[in-house]
């Protein structure tokens, strides 16, 4: 973790990642690292069709979900671990909790959960991209991971 950009802090719902300084839109906040496994786990991040990143002590595990996030996960087309980056969607001030929308990377969550983000566009129940309707998919399209886009195209749900 680049300590000049992110730090871990205890929040109301447990440990979370916070910015330590202001950053511009599209800044790389973190390069995600870990082991690759074929099946989703409770704290994994899907980086390919049957490829998930896991690490018991990685700082990215403390990124909270939000339906209106301030960051996104950028994956290169090969899902190379060096190509998994967390980028700012908007300019961020120092001390802001960093969030991303889990529905942009996860086809089917190993452990679905009710969302408590409170956003007007809240999905309500976070189960995975496969459960989203056309309107929600259209809104998320710019930040959907390549493997999610490919799966949706194969199902005829994304043009």
What are these regions (language model features)?
Residues 1-159:
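Conserved catalytic SET/PR domain of SAM-dependent protein methyltransferases, capturing the structural core
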């Amino acid at each position: 973790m680049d300590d000049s950009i992110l730090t871990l802090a205890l929040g109301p719902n447990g440990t979370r990642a916070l910015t330590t300084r202001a950053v511009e839109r599209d800044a790389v906040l973190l390069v995600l690292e870990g082991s690759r496994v074929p099946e989703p786990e409770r704290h994994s991040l899907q980086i390919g069709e049957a490829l998930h990143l896991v690490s018991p002590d990685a700082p990215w595990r403390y990124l909270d979900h939000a339906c209106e996030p301030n960051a996104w996960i950028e994956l290169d087309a090969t899902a190379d671990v060096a190509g998994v980056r967390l980028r700012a969607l908007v300019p961020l001030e120092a001390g802001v909790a960093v969030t991303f929308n889990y529905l942009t990377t996860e086809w089917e969550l190993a452990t679905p959960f009710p969302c408590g983000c409170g956003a007007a566009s809240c999905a309500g129940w976070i189960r995975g991209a496969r459960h989203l309707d056309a309107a929600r998919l259209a809104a998320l399209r710019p930040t959907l991971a390549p493997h999610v886009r490919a799966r949706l195209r194969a199902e005829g749900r994304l043009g």
